[in-house]
Amino acid sequence: MSEKELPWERMSIETLEREYSPSSCVTNYEELVHSYTSESNKISKILKFEKDLIYGISSEEKLDLCLADVDDSPLVIFIHGGYWQLLSKDDCLFPAKDFVDTGISYCSIDYTLAPRAHINEMIEQCIRAVQWLYQSASNYGYDEKKLFLIGSSAGAHLAAMTMLADWKNYDLPADIIKGCTLLSGVYDIRPIVKTYINEPLNLDMQTASMLSPLFKVKQHAADLIISWGENETDEFKRQSIEFEKKWKACGNTSNLMEIKGNNHFDIVFNMMKKDCALRELIIEQIMRVS
């Protein structure tokens, strides 16, 4: 292998597709994904949500907001996964209760899925959501100076790209995002170009490079948490390690954590476990700024 050649560049298509298929490491994929919906349905009956708030220019640009009973609370903005093709904000309400009980408001956002939208459009939608939330803070009582992103899987990719946006182009502070947690993400999306995953995404190598946060890393004020499950493919683990390495090389702060016993699909539930180191890191990150 040459110095510049990456592991995925020498993989067969079969191996590449297995490495970028998180379900290859679990036997109960459908059950785990269904639990997002069932747990979210339970939470939506317990908590009051401001539902289907339009943040952008299309009817699909909506978000749900659950407010903590605290003046000027921090706000966590969650971006769901699903390989840019599946799931919705409604499937990701389940973390809200723990955050709200801790004095942190919670938001779950929708974005238009592939093939109806290209990834670059999804990134712009996530940016618009943050822009709207920043400008709407006084209407809902959270603090626009305490915005935090959390993304899972494809949502981690979108969260990273959103964090790294040139916010001055949107007339917003460069440090609008105070902290970001990335769970089981893909930060160099070139490997998926050759796989079945790309069929609805329609990416080529040049576009994939342009839309990869790995190649956008710069000096940044946000505190970063990068995590993945023990039971994930080597490529998902490598992607997280390489992104954090580049992040730190730019002089930025970060925490890197593999969660023992977890996989790509159940790691998100660690945000709600009181004795979990990931939850402690996230809460500590938020409270340090707040």
Residue positions per predicted region:
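The feature captures the conserved acid-bearing segment of alpha/beta-hydrolase catalytic domains
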Residues: 173-175, 179-193, 205-242
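Catalytic nucleophile-loop/oxyanion-hole region of alpha/beta-hydrolase
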Residues: 87-96, 107-146, 272-273
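Primarily recognizes the serine-hydrolase "nucleophile elbow" in alpha/beta-hydrolase
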Residues: 128-196, 209
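N-terminal cap/lid segment of alpha/beta-hydrolase-fold proteins
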Residues: 15-71
